[in-house]
Amino acid sequence: MNSINIAIDGPASSGKSTVAKIIAKNLNYTYLDTGAMYRCATYLALQHGYEAQDVSKILGLLAERPISFGKAEDGSQTVFLGTEEVTLAIRQNDVTNNVSWVSAIPEIREELVNQQRRIAKDGAIIMDGRDIGTVVLPDAELKIFLVASVDERAERRFKENQEKGIESDFETLKSEIAARDYKDSHREVSPLEAAEDAIEFDTTGVSIEGVVTFIQEKAEKIIDMKN
């Protein structure tokens, strides 16, 4: 059966990763969490006190401790830097609040985009991020751009943090998400924007199942047309 590549983009906490993981499982596709890759670079930078001008040192650390993905016993995805599992460490608030400046460094983006393209070259990949449809996989057969209100996204992030045992304040999350939106959409390199041929879907008030159904039906239609 012919497979396709699926690109899902959108701002922070728009539901990209949750939806992408479910669709990947349903279609037996590989899910690539590009956001986790930028979080890994951010985690390394913070661990060593590096700033934007230390790009060569951050790239050196990424070469020494390559990013890889695994699966936990419950089937959830795990993230590694070298031999260290960083699945939860890269979701801490300090990483979340610094990932924008790290992901805006052109050399970091170039390195991670090249890694992402290598993984996707054989197809049957579902990838989520902020520039998948525009930069990483411009030839993806299906491109989705998810949006949602700041309030809704802050509520999702608050619940996620609670489930992971991460302390957070709802109003602080709202302001952080709004600030992240501004940074992501105004950066010089690969700003957050929908690809011209992307299907935009507002997930405000829509259940996860509803979003999954919307995207999966479109994916299956394209797959059927290829076979």
Curated annotation (Swiss-Prot):
GO biological process terms, semicolon-separated: nucleobase-containing small molecule interconversion; pyrimidine nucleotide metabolic process
From the record, what ranges are coiled-coil?
none
Instruction: State whether keyword Secreted applies.
Output: no
Where would you find this protein in the cell? Cytoplasm
Sorted keywords for this record are: ATP-binding, Cytoplasm, Kinase, Nucleotide-binding, Transferase
What family does the database annotate? Belongs to the cytidylate kinase family. Type 1 subfamily.
This chain belongs to the protein called: Cytidylate kinase
The organism's taxonomic lineage, starting at the top: Bacteria, Bacillati, Bacillota, Bacilli, Lactobacillales
Q: Which gene encodes it?
A: cmk
